[in-house]
Amino acid sequence: MPELPEVETIRRTLLPLIVGKTIEDVRIFWPNIIRHPRDPEAFAARMIGQTVRGLERRGKFLKFLLDRDALISHLRMEGRYAVASALEPLEPHTHVVFCFTDGSELRYRDVRKFGTMHVYAKEEADRRPPLAELGPEPLSPAFSPAVLAERAVKTKRSVKALLLDQTVVAGFGNIYVDESLFRAGILPGRPAASLSSKEIERLHEEMVATIGEAVMKGGSTVRTYVNTQGEAGAFQHSLFVYGRKGEPCKRCGTPIEKTVVAGRGTHYCPRCQR
């Protein structure tokens, strides 16, 4: 699943390809992707005639800003966007097509059909699901060691489960939680409430640093992720633990182990993390 760095990279590469373009038609081939309004015809009708004014990101969600409305898109596991000429044939697994007046199209493909789309009036979008439930952005001042500590002391969950909770901090998934915990020297299965104030500060610092570095490197391509221009990310070459089961730790040489924490495959170094 694309996490914050991958979605941010998609946002940056997609924005110049669609900004200023006016929607002439919307074709929907898999209605289950449409979540609000549930009626696909109503979903399409309200966007026709509107111009793309911007593209933002909130956590793992893309937020397309139109004249009056905002389209909220979650890519889930395999969703991706591409811009192509209307004359080019559709690729397999294309489920939604936004046709522009200039003859180009924004095409949404999703092999697994898990993605979702919501349309709301712009002024309502942040107050409605799915955005309303999200916690602070990790690179914003709203996410501080104090905020993290407050949530940690109130839960019986593991620290990994806490960081995967999108109401705590928006945009972290399996890759960047594992990497942040390794860099902070904290075992993923530790109770979040057991972390000391120094560990909380170190974890916060490494979360911010890890996400920031991953954004600069265009995200991680560990399976199928590519940006809007078909380019792979580069942060996978900087991964310390994720996807490296059995390989030597880059810091101490101990083989990286894999277990299950919070229902997710979890990579860690049994020597570097406590």
Curated annotation (Swiss-Prot):
Zinc finger (FPG-type): 240-274
Comment on bound cofactor: Binds 1 zinc ion per subunit.
CDD domains hit by this protein: EcFpg-like_N (cd08966)
Cofactor(s), names only, from the UniProt record: Zn(2+)
PROSITE patterns hit by this protein: FPG_CAT, ZF_FPG_1, ZF_FPG_2
InterPro entries assigned to the protein according to its UniProt record, in alphabetical order: DNA_glyclase/AP_lyase_DNA-bd, DNA_glyclase_Znf_dom_DNA_BS, Formamido-pyr_DNA_Glyclase, FPG_cat, MutM-like_N-ter, Ribosomal_uS13-like_H2TH, Znf_DNA_glyclase/AP_lyase, Znf_FPG/IleRS
Catalytic residue positions: P2 (schiff-base intermediate with dna), E3 (proton donor), K60 (proton donor), R264 (proton donor)
Residues annotated for DNA binding in this entry: H93, R112
Membrane keyword on record: no
Alphabetized SUPFAM superfamilies for the sequence: Glucocorticoid receptor-like (DNA-binding domain), N-terminal domain of MutM-like DNA repair proteins, S13-like H2TH domain
Entry keyword Metal-binding: yes
Catalyzed reactions: Hydrolysis of DNA containing ring-opened 7-methylguanine residues, releasing 2,6-diamino-4-hydroxy-5-(N-methyl)formamidopyrimidine; 2'-deoxyribonucleotide-(2'-deoxyribose 5'-phosphate)-2'-deoxyribonucleotide-DNA = a 3'-end 2'-deoxyribonucleotide-(2,3-dehydro-2,3-deoxyribose 5'-phosphate)-DNA + a 5'-end 5'-phospho-2'-deoxyribonucleoside-DNA + H(+)
Superkingdom classification of source: Bacteria
Summary of subunit composition and partner proteins: Monomer.
Family per similarity comment: Belongs to the FPG family.
Name of this chain's protein: Formamidopyrimidine-DNA glycosylase
Originating species: Geobacillus kaustophilus (strain HTA426)
Gene: mutM
